[in-house]
Amino acid sequence: MKKALKIVVLAKQVPDTRNVGKDAMTPEGTVNRAALPAIFNPEDLNALEMALALKDETEGSTVHILTMGPPRAADIIRDAMFRGADGGYLLTDRKFAGADTLATSYALSCALRKIRPDVIVAGRQAIDGDTAQVGPQVAE
């Protein structure tokens, strides 16, 4: 019998850029996130799907989402639970606004040390920045 696993999926809420309107950009040339609806990062949905498949293979396993963002980022935790996740963790504080990938990775790593998962799954990259750095930085 396989040991039950505590699986955590790193996920991000990103702006939905499929239907960008005239207010999508700020005068400074950055994305006006308030003007765009927010969605579950598609690459992270792939990670969630993989985690849920692993959960199904190993009796007693759990899947939780870990995300960092404003309070509305809790929407992707609810979405993940609708898809089969057992719960989630939201790191939220105004001080996190504008965090770069290193700061984000550090905050997520601190949370992971407290959560103590057996397996961590991350998507390839977020569609809003395309840096593909948070997963590898958390892995270090």
Regions found by a protein language model. Name each.
Residues 1-140:
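N-terminal glycine-rich FAD/FM-binding segment characteristic of electron-transfer flavoproteins
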